[in-house]
A protein has these predicted regions:
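Conserved short-loop catalytic and cofactor-binding motifs
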Residues: 25-29, 53, 100-104
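C-terminal helical cap(s) of enzyme catalytic domains, especially alpha/beta-barrels
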Residues: 82-125
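Alpha/beta enzyme core
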Residues: 1-47, 59-71, 76, 86-90, ...
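Active-site mouth loops of central-metabolism enzymes
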Residues: 1-2, 51, 104-107
C-alpha cells in the first residue's frame, strides 16, 4: 500500500494496476487473490484499480471484487484468446480445403461474442 500511495502521488495516474495474486497469461482459474491487500491499497488511494491476469481469477471472485472494491478494469485477454484459438483450430480442422482467411475467421466471431457476453453477465447481479 505504501508504494501505491507514493506511485499514485508522484505519477498522477488515472488508474493503477496492482498485483494481489493475479498473474499475466494465466490459462486456468486458480489465482488466489489477496482481497485484504486490494482493500488496503484502495483505502490508501483514490485512484481506480486495474487487475491484469483477470482470466486466471475464478468467476465468483471476479464478481466479488467487482462489487466490493474499486477495481475498474479486469484484463481478460487470455480468456478471449483461448476461445478464439480453440474456435479457429476447430474451423481449420473441420474445413481443410478452405484457405480464405475471412472464411476461416468468420466462424470464430460467435464464439468470442458468446464468451464475452458470459464474462460480462458474470460480473452483474444474479
Amino acid at each position: 500500500p505504501n508504494e501505491a500511495v507514493t506511485f499514485a502521488k508522484e505519477s498522477n495516474v488515472d488508474a493503477m494496476a496492482v498485483s494481489a495474486g493475479n498473474t499475466h497469461l494465466q490459462t486456468n482459474k486458480i489465482a488466489k487473490i489477496d482481497l485484504e491487500k486490494i482493500k488496503e491499497i484502495q483505502n490508501s488511494i483514490s485512484t481506480p484499480l486495474v487487475l491484469h491476469g483477470g482470466s486466471g481469477i475464478p468467476n465468483l471472485i471476479r464478481k466479488k471484487l467487482a462489487r466490493e472494491t474499486n477495481i475498474a478494469k479486469f484484463n481478460i485477454g487470455t480468456e478471449l484468446r483461448m476461445t478464439f484459438g480453440n474456435a479457429l483450430r476447430k474451423q481449420v480442422k473441420n474445413n481443410p480445403l478452405i484457405y480464405d482467411r475471412l472464411q476461416l475467421l468468420k466462424p470464430t466471431i460467435p464464439e468470442i461474442t458468446k464468451i464475452t457476453k458470459k464474462i460480462i453477465k458474470n460480473f452483474g447481479p444474479q
